[in-house]
Amino acid sequence: MTLAAAAQLEKTPLETYVPPAKPSLIGLSRAELAERLGHIGVAPAQRKMRAQQLWNWMYLRGARDFSEMTNVSKEMRAQLSDHFTVDRPEVVAEQISNDGTRKWLLRLPSGDDVQKAHEVECVYIPETDRGTLCVSSQVGCTLNCSFCHTGTQRLVRNLTAGEIIGQVMVARDRLNDWVDRETPNGNRLVTNIVMMGMGEPLYNFEAVRDALLIVTDNEGIGISRRRVTLSTSGVVPNIIRTGEEIGVMLAISLHAVRDELRDELVPLNRKYPLKELLQACRDYPGASNARRITFEYVMLKGVNDSLDDARRLVQLLKGIPAKINLIPFNPWPGSAYECSDWDQIEKFSEYIFNAGYSSPVRTPRGRDILAACGQLKSETEKLSVRERDALRAMAMTD
């Protein structure tokens, strides 16, 4: 990344970050909203009704300020404003790819030192029949997958439920995609959610669960569970919990068919090897031909792309209602891998298809803004110390 490109990404220096003075209500359940209302003196008999009003304004209509909540009394609005906000994460920068993909860099409180801030990225991918939002669950990642750019950034902290749902709300804000606002043909622009951004969702299970329950609530964000996919590298103990407590579609970052290679590509495999992972998939609640598990397989030249690998993959998935997404490797600075040749990807896909599995090849999106699969990483983490210092100096004079 050039210094000029970095300056476009981040105009506000980290030194000027001001932590929020009041807590945001974003990310709270109805019961938690009622509890907070009790803290400011709302009578017990009114809490449930008032909590439902807040819920509808925040998650259905996308209110950005209590003053917008016209069916709430002026006195109550003032009281809410004195104690709380409905703020989302701060949008530091937006990049738009040549193919229409959008990437937002979002700034969050650090969670410990209130004078510092952290960043995450989320990505919106428009298609003719859907609009998919790729959401992050952690600042950084702990898994160190060798082919993944995010894996080169250390894990900083888990996101809260509010910070996860806040990414969805930011996207709807930026796309003008709320119920009361105009969208093309009256349709929503964000139709699908994939937990495939920064971090391992199942190492932040409770916050991810709470956020996705808001996403899939018919009186909230209102996206069907069948349009929400959670991707995991294989945190086996929480796979069954995902089906039981969240009920969304499951995707597995597989990428190898032999434990020895997967140990290298996805080090989590040393803790939860293929046999345990695939058994958890066979036991996943609700899995069927109508609700197939997606297996993601990044195509690495000369590493995992042989026809023998394809044969082993078909054997491994026997008995699992599955589809296989083949992902051309997206290069990033410093990577040791190359993408498989296109002819080899097609041969691999054809073998799997002839064995009875859907095997689409994922079209890379947003490569020019490092928004494609495996490319996400907080921008301030990417910069060298020298570039970061220069960027801050420029921002201070803007």
UniProtKB/Swiss-Prot annotation:
CDD domains: Radical_SAM
UniProt-listed InterPro entries: Aldolase_TIM, Methyltransferase_A, RlmN_N, RNA_MTrfase_RlmN, rRNA_lsu_MTrfase_RlmN/Cfr, rSAM
UniProt feature coiled coil, ranges: none
Cofactor binding: number and manner: Binds 1 [4Fe-4S] cluster. The cluster is coordinated with 3 cysteines and an exchangeable S-adenosyl-L-methionine.
GO biological process: rRNA base methylation; tRNA methylation
Pfam families to which the protein is assigned, alphabetical: Radical_SAM (PF04055), RlmN_N (PF21016)
Keywords from the named record: 4Fe-4S, Cytoplasm, Disulfide bond, Iron, Iron-sulfur, Metal-binding, Methyltransferase, rRNA processing, S-adenosyl-L-methionine, Transferase, tRNA processing
Stretches assigned to the Radical SAM core domain: 127-370
Subcellular location: Cytoplasm
HAMAP family hit by this protein: RNA_methyltr_RlmN
Additional comment: Reaction proceeds by a ping-pong mechanism involving intermediate methylation of a conserved cysteine residue.
PANTHER family found in the cross-reference section: 23S RRNA METHYLTRANSFERASE, RADICAL SAM CORE DOMAIN-CONTAINING PROTEIN
Protein name: Dual-specificity RNA methyltransferase RlmN
Species whose genome carries this gene: Rhodopseudomonas palustris (strain BisB5)
